[in-house]
Design a protein with these regions (language model features):
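Intrinsic disorder/low-complexity segments
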Residues: 1-36
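Extracellular, repeat-based ectodomains that mediate carbohydrate processing or recognition
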Residues: 33-423
């Protein structure tokens, strides 16, 4: 009897031990699975090998996918390229050339293409083309439209309506829920350039520009008469456009104030871009600069409150040099005191990526050319590294993940890379 009880006890112990081992194995496997899911895939080159590629820009689509556009350079010729990615970051087909005539585009580090996706899935790309004729030269703004998810593009349409040659650039693009397309840019048609004799010896400085706007109500086939929104605008700082769900249009730019103070300004329109509110200076940064910082504002809506957020770089006397954030809850009539996001020198225009649940700032840190990010929805979050050797980043949130496109350099060769950043 005692021997039988001992055998039964040993059997029960073996069962318990097997159960414990199985439970531990399940926990370990689950832990490994969680680690695997949390670890983002490595960065991947998305531009063609051996091609000099730069100026990336991103845009989210309503179905959770996203697009990346960039510019491939070959001496004085350039092409705007577009690639489509699903909500897992997997590329859908080969990149497509946006401009119909090969080599017709132009771009530089401060003025990348503009990109937007409509609620019906139509893809719109804004870009600039250089022209030279009879001793005159300049750049024009064009819009290209695709109705098949970026697989092909119709013939581009010129947006600026002036006839005399001149520079048009630092453009931005936004599409409303009703399909109305807005394009903003800096324009020199009314600018009186100083004569060579009026310039200080050995000193070159761009004249300030006017901010212009045009809109299309027919899918980008035609555009309205060009409308001037502001004068004395910093000539080499990117503009920004944003349309809220209620149709309110916001425009942001860097205004040059008396004394050469260069501060961020925002105006809004409630009637489809016909009339705008008086521009409001977001923050008195006390940044006096005899030159252009090549850094404009980024606009986004707060995912929870719907308020307008502005992200920009400043190096003025009002505080630390760095990246700042401000918020408006009254349609850009007033702004909250600025919040320091990162105290450091920043290159280029920072990106403000907004998703359904969060907003993330992305920027290039000067010096080593490192791309950084900070989740603005997490209390007490700090800046973290996205990638080294990563310049002029563009960020987009898809499927609650942040994807960052950036320029990598190897010797003098540039290429476009895409990485899913953990957050």
């Amino acid at each position: 009897m005692v021997h039988g009880k001992a055998q039964k006890a040993q059997k029960d112990l073996r069962i318990v031990m097997c159960f414990v081992c199985l439970s531990v194995a399940i926990v370990l496997l689950a832990g490994c699975a969680r680690v695997s899911l949390q670890e983002p895939p490595p960065a991947a080159q998305i531009s063609a090998p051996g091609v000099d590629a730069a100026e990336p820009v991103t845009a989210a689509a309503p179905d959770g996918s996203f697009y990346v556009a960039w510019v491939s350079h070959d001496a004085k010729q350039a092409d705007v390229m577009l690639a489509h990615f699903n909500d897992k970051g997997e590329r859908q087909g080969a990149p497509v050339r946006v401009n119909r005539q090969a080599g017709a585009a132009t771009a530089w580090r401060g003025d990348q293409p503009s990109l937007a996706v409509a609620t019906d899935g139509s893809v719109y790309v804004g870009w600039t083309a250089r022209f030279e004729a009879a001793g005159a030269h300049g750049t024009d703004i064009y819009l290209s439209a695709s109705n098949d998810r970026g697989q092909s593009f119709a013939s581009e349409v010129k947006v600026n309506d002036d006839k005399a040659p001149g520079d048009h650039g630092m453009h931005s693009l936004a599409v409303a829920k009703d399909g109305r397309i807005y394009v903003g840019w800096l324009d020199e048609r009314n600018v009186q350039h100083p004569k060579p004799s009026d310039k200080a010896e050995g000193h070159h400085m761009e004249s300030n520009r006017d901010l212009f706007l045009a809109y299309s109500t027919d899918g980008g086939r035609t555009f309205s008469a060009n409308q001037k929104l502001a004068s004395e605008v910093c000539p080499c700082c990117k503009t920004s456009l944003l349309v809220a769900p209620d149709g309110t249009l916001y425009a942001g730019w860097r205004q040059v104030l008396p004394g050469s103070f260069r501060h961020i300004a925002v105006a809004s329109s409630k009637d489809g871009g016909t009339n705008f509110s008086s521009p409001v200076i977001v923050s008195d940064d006390r940044w006096m600069l005899q030159g252009c910082p090549v850094s404009g504002p980024s606009l986004a809506l707060d995912p929870s409150s719907g308020s307008l957020r502005v992200l920009w770089y400043a190096a003025g006397d009002a505080g630390a040099t760095g990246l700042y954030l401000s918020e408006s809850k009254d349609n850009a009539r007033s702004f909250s005191p600025r919040q320091l996001i990162s105290e450091e020198v920043v290159h280029g225009t920072p990106a403000l990526a907004a998703g359904t649940h969060n907003a993330i700032a992305v920027w290039q840190s000067a010096g080593a050319g490192e791309t950084k990010m900070r989740d603005l929805g997490k209390e007490g979050s700090a800046a973290s590294s996205v990638a080294a050797n990563a310049e002029l980043p563009a960020g987009v949130i898809a499927n609650d993940h942040l994807y960052v496109a950036y320029i990598a350099k190897e010797k003098e060769q540039r290429s476009i890379w895409l990485v899913r950043a953990s957050h």
